[in-house]
Amino acid sequence: MEFAVQSNVIRHLSKEQYQTLRELCQLSNNLYNVALYNIRQYFFSQKLFLTYESNYHECKDNENYVLLQAGVAQQTLKVADRSFKSFFSLLKKCKTGDYRYNDVKIPHYRKKGGYFNLILSTNAISVKDGYFKLPISREYRKLHPDMEDILIPYPERLNDAELKEVRICPHDNGRYFKIQYVYHWYQEKTLVNPDNIMAIDLGVSNLATCVSNVETPFIMDGRKLKSINRYWNKEKARLQSIAMKQGMRTTHQISKITIKRNNCVNDIIKKTARYIINNCIEHQIGTLIIGYNKDFKRYVNIGKINNQNFVQIPLSNLRQQLQFLCWTYNIEYIEQEESYTSKSSFLDNDILPEYKAEQQYLGKFSGKRIHRGLYQSKNGTLINADVNGSANIGRKCKQNFCIEELSSGLLASPKRIRVV
């Protein structure tokens, strides 16, 4: 069993209700800092960790705790508790050599006057007549006797779901809010064959090139993502130049176009992952292989424009979404190191060495890339370059992934899929 999250923007509240959300998120922010202060000071003075139970007794009479609903306040204390536990776990890794001491920082306070999540556990969640009701403490209602209940429409698709947690998340300095429903997610029984394999090469214009031994190759189009990023970069630069002349770092307009860009990118990524997984289910593909190199974005140097296009596309989000869907439908998910898969010729069965920074591979490959997107094998056969790379990823991971198993469409132009 895993957990899934549905995130929705909170809309159609009154001005007073939005102000209530801001005040509650500020109280949560203040309480987090109070809890963290207690843990830090105890650590500095005693060189020990202040437990959650002890910290609770220190904070329960604090005005920020009293004004928040008890369950929400306790969850905020637990977040501070987990932050320091993570700090101690990293210190343990430093002792074993897995981490450097210089990279481990003690948890810092949140910005004064800022906003923090409202986290509701099961005992504070109330859903009735299609609406989620935000819990408000008695003390807060005494300060605001005329306030109305905050009712948020509850998604119909979650009517039968087992909620684990609900989070109210402030964004853009409290300009808007999202509500996140965390619920139990179960695997589905799917008829798949582990010998049916799909290999995927991630890219930019070709977001995902998919090659299978039971289906013709296809390419998930990434040019729409490039277009969205190109417009966002251009418009953001224009607005920032205006803002800087007025001594501002950001503006409401910059925030709006950034939110819109992020929503569009997230939509394309999720639809792409869903199309790929649906294709796997349709053809009973039981093994999904993704080409991946660690830090392949961090040290990339392919020119200013190409760097911008490549780095701003969230390929890690696509991999995570595919991994989650693979778990859901009992498909084996594999991440394969993909060095030299673009240079090696799949049709000629070239060797596939592994990249080593201290020892460069000096061998020669049978084929070569003669044009953008076109690869020529030793005997002159032309195939799509990304299809060649994707097939090599499958061959590098599975020794039985060979040309005889591939569909005849490998040598033809792969179909291009555009998600809308």
Predicted features along the sequence, with ranges:
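Nucleic-acid substrate recognition interfaces
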Residues: 1-420
